[in-house]
């Protein structure tokens, strides 16, 4: 029996077998490490790499391409330099530096790459957003008009902050800058504001202390802490604020409110200077690179109040595809950058840069701090350029003259040191000023609801505290607010709901205060 080979049968068998064959080969664009050290790697090859693209080095070390030169790529390493050596192969990832975002991030401590560092397991998120993104254009924004209450009397009365504003907290070391930011985060409880605290170049123990404080006051449930401590590589400290802005933008663009604290941007500028000098970029003033202003301006411009018109918001520039279906209007991102000055020098390079970018500054002074005035805010040079339109009517009414009264008090106080014979009017003005200074003092981690602030500042500016002994002002405040809460809660509720201080409410408040002052003075006779 002869066997005949049929060509069509052979070709059909081959087709079937070839159809089941899958090529296992994967093509990567790779380069070679030429030189490595101080958190910087020079890589040969990678001719198609993009600026800001993530690179994969051996031993699970990630890096980012920053300098695209003619014959090599300057990359910063996000891990230990000693794990990378000359001749190692570097892979392109074709992914721009990005972090995972979502509600699952709340209550967690992460590094600037979005990896959890609190030992509570992995974070389940569906969306990744790029670290770098252009700020929303003018037509997608709305002017700041809603208040962001800090719970601090001195700030909410004289330097009000609105949702979508950038307000700088500036001062020497150990003047309470972080305390102001943490109090603001604690005060957002129940107000629908998601908070992001970015720790840049702080000690690990300081970050742990902040996390413990936020947990103690139940603030971690709506807060994410992004930490790049002093022991982390400089490139991680440089990208940390961008990670915070990206997470905040997720809440902003989905129609919610977010607050991001950058603590502090001086250390980010130092980290960026270190990276730039190692990459051989030309130095400028104080050895900072020429684009250090742009580093901070492109970061802080991302804080914005977004238009309520959802159709306009959906057309926002640079909107990542992952967010397009989730966009809602009316969201906001408020930024509180922190800057540390040296010996109160606000005219140094980085402080003046950030002052000119932000919408105002809260200046904290060591002299005031050491004299017992806390928060140690220098009202004279602190300002909020857009917050006035966000302040509630009641506060605007009672605190209208507060700044002027305090300025006059400071001036008279300086003059009164020269002579003892003061006329009645001057003495009365000094006495009232001293009481106003006293009522603006506040303990740490005890933010005050705005309606209580209105009540106590009303008493101070109306002169109802003029006869109360200065030593007992704090005690008076405590007992008076306690009385309002227990017996006259309807007054506080009315101020809180309407946001205004009606004439009848003011009259009732005055009446209660006059009676209480008499009782209090009788009880606390020296």
From Swiss-Prot:
GO molecular function terms attached to this record: ADP binding; ATP binding; proton-transporting ATP synthase activity, rotational mechanism
InterPro entries, per the entry: ATP_synth_asu-like_sf (IPR023366), ATP_synth_asu_C (IPR000793), ATP_synth_asu_C_sf (IPR038376), ATP_synth_F1_a_nt-bd_dom (IPR033732), ATP_synth_F1_asu (IPR005294), ATPase_a/bsu_AS (IPR020003), ATPase_F1/V1/A1_a/bsu_N (IPR004100), ATPase_F1/V1/A1_a/bsu_N_sf (IPR036121)
GO CC, any one term: proton-transporting ATP synthase complex
UniProt keyword annotations, A-Z: ATP synthesis, ATP-binding, Cell inner membrane, Cell membrane, CF(1), Hydrogen ion transport, Ion transport, Membrane, Nucleotide-binding, Translocase, Transport
Site (Required for activity): residue numbering on this chain: 382
Major enzyme class: translocase
Catalytic function, reaction form: ATP + H2O + 4 H(+)(in) = ADP + phosphate + 5 H(+)(out)
Disulfide-bonded cysteines: none
Coarse class of the protein's main subcellular location: membrane
Gene3D superfamilies from the UniProt entry: 2.40.30.20, ATP synthase alpha/beta chain, C-terminal domain, P-loop containing nucleotide triphosphate hydrolases
Tree of life domain: Bacteria
HAMAP family noted in UniProt: ATP_synth_alpha_bact (MF_01346)
NCBIfam families reported in the protein's UniProt record: atpA, PRK13343.1
Function as written in the Swiss-Prot or TrEMBL entry: Produces ATP from ADP in the presence of a proton gradient across the membrane. The alpha chain is a regulatory subunit.
UniProt family annotation: Belongs to the ATPase alpha/beta chains family.
Protein name: ATP synthase subunit alpha
Source organism of the structure: Pelodictyon phaeoclathratiforme (strain DSM 5477 / BU-1)
């Amino acid at each position: 029996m002869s066997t005949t080979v049929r060509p069509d049968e052979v070709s059909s068998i081959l087709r079937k077998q070839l159809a089941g064959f899958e090529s296992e080969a994967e093509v990567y664009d790779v380069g070679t490490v030429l030189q490595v050290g101080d958190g910087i790697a020079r890589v040969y090859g990678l001719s198609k790499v993009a600026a800001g693209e993530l690179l994969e080095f051996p031993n699970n070390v990630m890096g980012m391409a920053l300098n695209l030169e003619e014959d090599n790529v300057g990359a910063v390493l996000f891990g230990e330099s000693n794990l990378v050596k000359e001749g190692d192969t570097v892979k392109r990832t074709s992914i721009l530096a990005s972090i995972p975002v979502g509600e699952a991030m709340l209550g967690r401590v992460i590094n600037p790459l979005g990896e959890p560092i609190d030992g509570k397991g992995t974070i389940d998120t569906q969306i990744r957003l790029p670290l770098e993104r252009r700020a929303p254009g003018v037509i997608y924004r709305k002017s700041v008009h809603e208040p962001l209450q800090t719970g601090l009397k001195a700030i909410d009365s004289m330097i009000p902050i609105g949702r979508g504003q950038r307000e700088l907290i500036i001062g020497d070391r150990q003047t309470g800058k972080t305390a102001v930011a943490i109090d603001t985060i604690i005060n957002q409880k129940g107000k629908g504001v998601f908070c992001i605290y970015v720790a840049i170049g702080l000690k690990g123990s300081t970050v742990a202390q902040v996390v413990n404080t936020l947990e103690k006051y139940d603030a971690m449930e709506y807060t994410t802490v992004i930490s790049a401590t002093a022991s982390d590589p400089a490139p991680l400290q440089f990208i940390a604020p961008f990670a915070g802005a990206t997470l905040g933008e997720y809440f902003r663009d989905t129609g919610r409110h977010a607050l991001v604290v950058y603590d502090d941007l001086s250390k980010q500028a130092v980290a960026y200077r270190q990276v730039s000098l190692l990459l051989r970029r030309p130095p400028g003033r104080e050895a900072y690179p020429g684009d250090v202003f742009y580093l901070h301006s492109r970061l802080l411009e991302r804080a914005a109040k977004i238009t309520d018109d959802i159709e306009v918001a959906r057309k926002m520039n640079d909107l990542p595809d992952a967010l397009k279906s989730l966009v809602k209007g009316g969201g906001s991102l408020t930024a509180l950058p922190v800057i540390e000055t040296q010996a109160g020098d606000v005219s140094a390079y980085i402080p003046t840069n950030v002052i000119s970018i932000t919408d105002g500054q809260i200046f904290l002074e060591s002299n005031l701090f050491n004299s017992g005035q806390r928060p140690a805010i220098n009202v004279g040079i602190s300002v909020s350029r857009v917050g006035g339109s966000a302040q509630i009517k009641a506060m605007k009414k009672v605190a209208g003259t507060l700044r002027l009264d305090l300025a006059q008090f400071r001036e008279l106080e300086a003059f009164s040191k020269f002579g003892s014979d003061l006329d009645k009017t001057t003495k009365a003005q000094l006495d009232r000023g001293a009481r106003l200074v006293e009522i603006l003092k506040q303990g740490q981690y005890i933010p005050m609801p705005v309606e209580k602030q209105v009540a106590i500042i009303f008493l101070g500016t109306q002169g109802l505290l003029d006869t109360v002994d200065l030593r007992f002002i704090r005690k008076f405040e405590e007992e008076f607010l306690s009385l309002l809460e227990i017996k006259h809660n309807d007054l506080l509720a009315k101020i809180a709901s309407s946001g205004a201080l009606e004439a009848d409410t003011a009259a009732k408040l005055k009446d209660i205060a006059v009676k209480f002052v008499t009782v209090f003075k009788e009880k606390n006779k020296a």
